[in-house]
């Protein structure tokens, strides 16, 4: 199943710079492994925001929930998920 996911990150000032850097490093490794596996085929930054739009290609809701809740930045994220379906006018 395909999902459009919007993620906004808000790391509170109570998190030290060192801890934030560590979390971001873990996040990068985690997300790149998912990209290499094909489960996270598209990732775009939102200009001027600490946010992204992503496409996930996973088995279903439970798989996506497991992936998203495993993100090291998950505790600091607001996430919106939209399931996608093929459009009848699409030529692909």
Please state what every model-predicted region is.
Residues 1-92:
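Conserved, structured core segments of small domains
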